[in-house]
């Protein structure tokens, strides 16, 4: 009986890992593309040519190299230099009636200063079999200051 249960458990674990392989591959590609974009937005060495190969067709039409440079300068001017960015959330858009919409969102947080942070949002959709960036947003976050407790 123990052998039968062990074989059943082993076969279930193998099949579960096989189903996860497809999602892991897509997530890995999205994470690479988002990391390159985040690096370019936060003052890294990535160029528009390197980053734009992961853009969707519609985003490439809207966001030229000149516009991208303006966005980079705007981020630096309005938010500051963002350091220590970390992926904190992968969100898959799911509708209860329609199911998975094919849109994935990756959210990064970065440190600007001791009490100022930045949230970087990158949205993906699958285009020609590969995940492509459809939108991104960088917004500042400042923690709420709590009043001292009354005694």
What are these regions (language model features)?
Residues 31-35, 52, 56, 117:
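Residue-level signal for cytosolic alpha-helical hairpin/rod architecture
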Residues 43-44, 106:
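Long beta-sheet-rich domains in secretory-pathway and surface-associated proteins
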Residues 49-99:
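Short solvent-exposed beta->alpha transition segments
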Residues 91-151:
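Exposed beta-sheet edge and beta->alpha loop/turn motif
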